[in-house]
């Protein structure tokens, strides 16, 4: 166990796992339709600046001996110091070492595989050399944007994103065109698998294979089957990197079946996955009291942006409508929306055009909107993992944040108890007033 400035990092090199990947029974398969065209980095990159990571460390990005184009992009985007996760992962990752990393939300995991892949890429027109898989369309879209931002000065590198929502023929057209074919493919398992299966995406030249939020994909049999088939279509010798905020011992073992002697980095023990700088409270109330209390909180709390989580599409739609009736700048995202509309709404929220987002758990994992500093669980999450991913929307990159969970039933109370036991935290009752200095970054 190596103690870092404010985190515990467990780092180890594991032995090669000789086990074959197991086969799984057929499961219901959802093939997601496709996505926008590949972007070259002559296109305008997202100019949104996140600022420096939390903590001041002696190690700077220059110490990683990255390409000048990458260092220029890092500086241009306002990053100054690597996070603890990046300090431990990047030096090995850029050498092609397999990486298995568990780190809490907001610690810069995405930049690890983006920088490692871009550092090593040798683009050849018509060849896909990097595949990144993730479990939602929104996350795929966001990761594609991160590649675009960091490769803004690598004008010969093209990134494409493939997910459901548009006809697959659009993706097939891009991949068939040597001048448009992306060198980096970000996608959801269903759509990527369909393109590989139909021999439209040639994975035989892939050198880097990445799973983000890997537990979500490997726990679901249909997604796991798709991931395995894509994996088998790639060369035996390649770099494999997997990342998530939560990794059970079983899933860790599954991950390592895809890898050869991976560097394993576990930031904070699983039982201590708390978010630094995040104030967490709960509030007991009746179901019928939720709307009035939410109204009071939105009136009285100071916030940049707030995420409100509910348990169903219907409740998301109804609560969003109610908030708009009360003149709150609200918008909602849920699985019932057409893909183009979901992406449009996500962009509006990220661009600060709306300050309140009502969402189902589809928005809970991996989605990064840096201005969010308050999360309200209007409906309790289903389990401790879901809670972690929801409240992780606030307090990104070690900044301050506030999470409030409504508890209105015995079942809610049980979930709260499991959360406290799992993460060894005591979540107190919401006081009459909360000092804004404790959750607003000055």
Swiss-Prot record:
<dbReference type="Pfam" id="PF00270">
    <property type="entry name" value="DEAD"/>
</dbReference>
<dbReference type="InterPro" id="IPR014001">
    <property type="entry name" value="Helicase_ATP-bd"/>
</dbReference>
<dbReference type="GO" id="GO:0006397">
    <property type="term" value="P:mRNA processing"/>
</dbReference>
<feature type="domain" description="Helicase ATP-binding">
    <location>
        <begin position="90"/>
        <end position="265"/>
    </location>
</feature>
<keyword id="KW-0509">mRNA transport</keyword>
<dbReference type="Pfam" id="PF00271">
    <property type="entry name" value="Helicase_C"/>
</dbReference>
<dbReference type="GO" id="GO:0005524">
    <property type="term" value="F:ATP binding"/>
</dbReference>
<dbReference type="GO" id="GO:0005681">
    <property type="term" value="C:spliceosomal complex"/>
</dbReference>
<feature type="short sequence motif" description="Q motif">
    <location>
        <begin position="59"/>
        <end position="87"/>
    </location>
</feature>
<comment type="function">
    <text>ATP-binding RNA helicase involved in transcription elongation and required for the export of mRNA out of the nucleus. SUB2 also plays a role in pre-mRNA splicing and spliceosome assembly. May be involved in rDNA and telomeric silencing, and maintenance of genome integrity.</text>
</comment>
<keyword id="KW-0547">Nucleotide-binding</keyword>
<feature type="binding site">
    <location>
        <begin position="103"/>
        <end position="110"/>
    </location>
    <ligand>
        <name>ATP</name>
    </ligand>
</feature>
<dbReference type="InterPro" id="IPR014014">
    <property type="entry name" value="RNA_helicase_DEAD_Q_motif"/>
</dbReference>
<feature type="short sequence motif" description="DECD box">
    <location>
        <begin position="212"/>
        <end position="215"/>
    </location>
</feature>
<dbReference type="GO" id="GO:0051028">
    <property type="term" value="P:mRNA transport"/>
</dbReference>
<dbReference type="GO" id="GO:0003724">
    <property type="term" value="F:RNA helicase activity"/>
</dbReference>
<protein>
    <recommendedName>
        <fullName>ATP-dependent RNA helicase SUB2</fullName>
        <ecNumber>3.6.4.13</ecNumber>
    </recommendedName>
</protein>
<dbReference type="GO" id="GO:0008380">
    <property type="term" value="P:RNA splicing"/>
</dbReference>
<dbReference type="GO" id="GO:0016887">
    <property type="term" value="F:ATP hydrolysis activity"/>
</dbReference>
<dbReference type="InterPro" id="IPR001650">
    <property type="entry name" value="Helicase_C-like"/>
</dbReference>
<dbReference type="GO" id="GO:0003723">
    <property type="term" value="F:RNA binding"/>
</dbReference>
<keyword id="KW-0694">RNA-binding</keyword>
<keyword id="KW-0508">mRNA splicing</keyword>
<keyword id="KW-0813">Transport</keyword>
<dbReference type="InterPro" id="IPR027417">
    <property type="entry name" value="P-loop_NTPase"/>
</dbReference>
<feature type="domain" description="Helicase C-terminal">
    <location>
        <begin position="277"/>
        <end position="438"/>
    </location>
</feature>
<comment type="similarity">
    <text>Belongs to the DEAD box helicase family. DECD subfamily.</text>
</comment>
<keyword id="KW-0347">Helicase</keyword>
<dbReference type="InterPro" id="IPR011545">
    <property type="entry name" value="DEAD/DEAH_box_helicase_dom"/>
</dbReference>
<keyword id="KW-0067">ATP-binding</keyword>
<keyword id="KW-0539">Nucleus</keyword>
<keyword id="KW-0747">Spliceosome</keyword>
<keyword id="KW-0507">mRNA processing</keyword>
<keyword id="KW-0378">Hydrolase</keyword>
């Amino acid at each position: 166990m190596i103690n870092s400035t404010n985190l515990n990092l467990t780092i180890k090199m594991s032995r090669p796992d000789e086990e074959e990947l197991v086969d799984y029974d057929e499961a219901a398969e959802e093939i997601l339709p496709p996505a926008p065209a590949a972007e070259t980095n002559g296109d305008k990159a997202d100019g949104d600046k996140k600022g420096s990571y939390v903590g001041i460390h002696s190690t700077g990005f220059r110490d990683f001996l990255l390409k000048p184009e990458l260092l220029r992009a890092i500086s241009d985007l306002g990053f100054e110091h690597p996070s603890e996760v990046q300090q431990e992962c990047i030096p090995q990752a850029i050498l092609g070492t397999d990486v298995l990393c568990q780190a809490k939300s907001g610690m810069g995991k995405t930049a690890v595989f983006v920088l490692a892949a871009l550092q090593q890429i040798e683009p050849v027109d018509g060849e896909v050399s990097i595949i990144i898989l993730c479990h939602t369309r929104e996350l795929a879209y966001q990761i594609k944007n991160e590649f675009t931002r960091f490769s803004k000065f690598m004008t010969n590198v093209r990134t494409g994103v493939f997910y459901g929502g548009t006809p697959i023929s659009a993706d097939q057209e891009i991949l068939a065109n040597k001048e448009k074919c992306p060198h980096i493919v970000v996608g959801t398992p269903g759509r990527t698998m369909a393109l590989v299966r139909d021999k439209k995406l040639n994975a035989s030249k892939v050198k880097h294979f990445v799973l983000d939020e890997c537990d979500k994909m490997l726990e679901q049999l249909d997604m796991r089957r798709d991931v395995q088939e894509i994996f088998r279509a790639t060369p035996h010798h390649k770099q494999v990197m997997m990342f998530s905020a939560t990794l059970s011992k079983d899933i860790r073992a599954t991950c390592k079946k895809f890898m050869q002697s991976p560097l394993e980095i576990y930031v904070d023990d699983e039982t201590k996955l708390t978010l630094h700088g995040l104030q967490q409270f709960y509030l007991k109330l009746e179901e019928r009291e939720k709307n009035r209390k939410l109204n009071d909180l939105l009136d009285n709390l100071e916030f940049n942006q707030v995420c409100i989580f509910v348990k169903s599409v219907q409740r998301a739609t109804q609560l969003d409508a109610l908030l708009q009736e009360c003149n709150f700048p609200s918008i909602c995202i849920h699985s019932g929306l057409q893909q183009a509309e979901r992406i449009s709404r996500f962009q509006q929220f990220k661009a600060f055009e709306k300050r309140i987002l009502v969402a189902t758990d589809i928005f809970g994992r991996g989605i990064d909107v840096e201005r969010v500093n308050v999360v309200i669980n209007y409906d309790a999450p289903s389990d401790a993992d879901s809670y972690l991913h929801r409240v992780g929307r606030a307090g990104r990159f070690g900044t301050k944040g506030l999470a409030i969970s409504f508890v209105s039933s015995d079942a809610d109370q049980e979930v709260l108890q499991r959360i406290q036991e799992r993460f060894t935290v005591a979540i107190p009752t919401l006081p009459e007033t909360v000092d804004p200095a404790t959750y607003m970054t000055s």
